[in-house]
C-alpha cells in the first residue's frame, strides 16, 4: 500500500519546478504519480495542469490578497496558495476539504509556521471572491497568457487571436488513431461501443477518432495489441500531405516519440523508414511505440543540421520534417508551454528550423516530397519560414498547401477539435 502523501504540496512543488526552474511537466509528473494511489493520480494531474492553465489568474489574485510576495525558501508557499485558490475556483472539492488539505500541505513542505497565513489568505479570498473576480475579468490577465505571447498572437491573427486564446485555455479532447492494418475505423468504433464508450470519426482524416469522454489507454479495445494509438487529429493530418507508398525510402526527422513513424508504417507497411531524433532519451519512446505496434524501422540518434553524420549521402523519396518549434499550437495539451517559452526563443527556433531545412533538402530525391510540419501557430516558424526557403531554394516547389505568397496550411487550436498545426508540402523539381 502506498504511503498517504499530501497531493497539494506535491502539486505546488511540481508547478514551482516548471515556473522557477524551466522544467517540463511531462518529465516531472510521471515520477510523482508513481508515489500515489491510482485514485489520487488523476487529482494530482488535475491540480498541476489546472494551476498551470490558470497561473496568471492565480498570481494576480495572490498579489491582491497579500501585501508582499513570498520569496526565497518560502516561495513554495506561494504555489501552495495557488493550488488552494485553484480548488476553490475550478473544482468540486468541498471548500472546507480544499482548505484543510492545502493548509496541511505546509507541514509537508516543512513550513508548518505558515499554516495560519495560508488559511488566512484562502479565507480572505472566499470573503472577497465576487469583487476580486469582477476586477480580474476587466484586466488583461483574464486571457491567461504571458504578455509577449498575447502580443504575437494579436499581431499574427488580428481577427482570431481571442478564439485561439480561448481554445488554449480549454481542456483538450482525446483523439485516437486506428491502426488500419488491424481494423477499419468503423469496425474499431463498433468494438469501442461494445466496451461502453463512444467515439466520433474525423471528417477529413481517415484514421482519426475523437472519444466522447477521455479514457485511460488500458481501457481502449486492443491498445496493448497495437490496434489504436493516442494522437491528435492535427498530427494525423501529416499523412494526408506525405502520402507514403510501399517500397519507398522515407525519413522521419525529429521523430520522437514515434507517433508519425508508426503512422507512416500503418499507411505503407512495406516502406523503408528511418526515424531520427536528436534526443536519445526520447528515442526510447520510438522503440516502445514500434514494439507495441509490431513494426520495424531503423532508429538513429542524430542532429537534423548534420545529416551526413547519420545517413551519409543517402537520398529519400519522402521526408517528414516535424521541426522543433515553440509548440504554441498545443498549449491546451501542455499548459506549461506558456511559462517555459520566452519571446527570445522564437527567432532562435526559426533559425534552427531554417538550418535543418537547408541541410536536409539535398537528401531528397528529384521528384520527391518533403512535408514541413510544426505544432506552432506563429508565422515566423511557419508561413514566413517556408516563404524564405522557397525564395532561396531554386528547385523547391510548393504543392497543394497554400500559395507562394502565403505558403502552407495553418490549423488553429480548436478548429475541428484539433490542435494548432502547420503543414507545407514541398516537391523537389
Swiss-Prot record:
Catalytic residues (positions): 375 (nucleophile)
Which Pfam families does its entry note?
Methyltr_RsmB-F (PF01189), NusB (PF01029), RsmF-B_ferredox (PF22458)
InterPro entries named among the record's database cross-references:
MeTrfase_RsmB-F_NOP2_cat, MeTrfase_RsmB-F_NOP2_dom, NusB-like_sf, NusB_RsmB_TIM44, RCMT, rRNA_ssu_MeTfrase_B, rRNA_ssu_MeTfrase_B_ent, RsmB-like_ferredoxin
Tell me what reaction this enzyme catalyses. cytidine(967) in 16S rRNA + S-adenosyl-L-methionine = 5-methylcytidine(967) in 16S rRNA + S-adenosyl-L-homocysteine + H(+)
Q: Name one GO molecular function term.
A: RNA binding
Which keywords has UniProt assigned to this entry? Cytoplasm, Methyltransferase, RNA-binding, rRNA processing, S-adenosyl-L-methionine, Transferase
Enzyme Commission numbers on file? 2.1.1.176
Example GO CC term: the record gives:
cytosol
Q: Which CDD domains match?
A: AdoMet_MTases, Methyltransferase_Sun
Residues bound to S-adenosyl-L-methionine = 254-260, 277, 303, 322
| PROSITE patterns recorded | NOL1_NOP2_SUN, SAM_MT_RSMB_NOP
Q: Which domain of life is it from?
A: Bacteria
Localization recorded for this chain is: Cytoplasm
Q: Which BP terms in the Gene Ontology apply to this protein?
A: regulation of DNA-templated transcription; rRNA base methylation
The principal localisation class reads cytoplasm
Function, as annotated, reads:
Specifically methylates the cytosine at position 967 (m5C967) of 16S rRNA.
What protein family does this chain belong to? Belongs to the class I-like SAM-binding methyltransferase superfamily. RsmB/NOP family.
* NCBIfam families named among the record's database cross-references: PRK10901.1, PRK14902.1, rsmB
Q: What is the name of this protein?
A: Ribosomal RNA small subunit methyltransferase B
Amino acid at each position: 500500500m502506498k504511503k498517504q502523501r499530501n497531493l497539494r504540496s506535491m502539486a505546488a512543488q511540481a508547478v514551482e519546478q516548471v515556473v522557477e526552474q524551466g522544467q517540463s511537466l511531462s518529465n516531472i509528473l510521471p515520477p510523482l504519480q508513481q508515489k500515489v494511489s491510482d485514485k489520487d493520480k488523476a487529482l494530482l494531474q488535475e491540480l498541476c495542469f489546472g494551476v498551470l492553465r490558470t497561473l496568471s489568474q492565480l498570481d494576480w489574485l495572490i498579489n491582491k490578497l497579500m501585501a508582499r510576495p513570498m520569496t526565497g525558501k518560502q516561495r513554495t508557499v506561494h504555489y501552495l496558495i495557488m493550488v488552494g485558490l485553484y480548488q476553490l475556483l475550478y473544482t468540486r472539492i468541498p471548500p472546507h476539504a480544499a482548505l484543510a488539505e492545502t493548509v496541511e500541505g505546509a507541514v509537508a513542505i516543512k513550513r508548518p509556521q505558515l499554516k495560519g497565513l495560508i488559511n488566512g489568505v484562502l479565507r480572505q479570498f472566499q470573503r472577497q471572491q465576487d469583487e476580486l473576480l469582477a476586477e480580474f475579468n476587466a484586466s488583461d490577465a483574464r486571457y491567461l497568457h504571458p504578455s509577449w505571447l498575447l502580443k504575437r498572437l494579436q499581431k499574427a491573427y488580428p481577427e482570431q487571436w481571442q478564439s485561439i486564446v480561448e481554445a488554449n485555455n480549454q481542456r483538450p479532447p482525446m483523439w485516437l488513431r486506428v491502426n488500419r492494418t488491424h481494423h477499419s475505423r468503423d469496425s474499431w468504433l463498433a468494438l469501442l461501443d461494445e466496451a461502453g464508450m463512444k467515439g466520433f470519426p474525423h471528417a477529413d482524416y481517415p484514421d482519426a477518432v475523437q472519444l466522447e469522454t477521455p479514457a485511460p489507454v488500458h481501457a481502449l479495445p486492443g491498445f496493448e495489441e497495437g490496434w489504436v494509438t493516442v494522437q491528435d487529429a492535427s498530427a494525423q493530418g501529416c499523412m494526408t500531405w506525405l502520402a507514403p507508398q510501399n517500397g519507398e525510402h522515407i525519413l522521419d526527422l525529429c521523430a520522437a516519440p514515434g507517433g508519425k513513424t508508426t503512422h507512416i508504417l500503418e499507411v505503407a507497411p512495406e516502406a523503408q523508414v528511418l526515424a531520427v531524433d536528436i534526443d536519445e532519451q526520447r528515442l526510447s519512446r520510438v522503440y516502445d511505440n514500434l514494439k507495441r505496434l509490431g513494426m520495424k524501422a531503423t532508429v538513429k540518434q542524430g542532429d537534423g543540421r548534420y545529416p551526413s553524420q547519420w545517413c551519409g549521402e543517402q537520398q529519400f523519396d519522402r521526408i517528414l520534417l516535424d521541426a522543433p518549434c515553440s509548440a504554441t499550437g498545443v498549449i491546451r495539451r501542455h499548459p506549461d508551454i506558456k511559462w517555459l517559452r520566452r519571446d527570445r526563443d522564437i527567432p532562435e527556433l526559426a533559425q534552427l528550423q531554417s538550418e535543418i531545412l537547408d541541410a536536409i533538402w539535398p537528401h531528397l530525391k528529384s521528384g520527391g516530397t518533403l512535408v514541413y510540419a510544426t505544432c506552432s501557430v506563429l508565422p515566423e516558424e511557419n508561413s514566413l519560414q517556408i516563404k524564405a526557403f522557397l525564395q532561396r531554394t531554386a528547385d523547391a516547389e510548393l504543392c497543394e498547401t497554400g500559395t507562394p505568397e502565403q505558403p502552407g496550411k495553418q490549423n488553429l487550436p480548436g478548429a475541428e477539435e484539433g490542435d494548432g498545426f502547420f503543414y507545407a508540402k514541398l516537391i523537389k523539381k
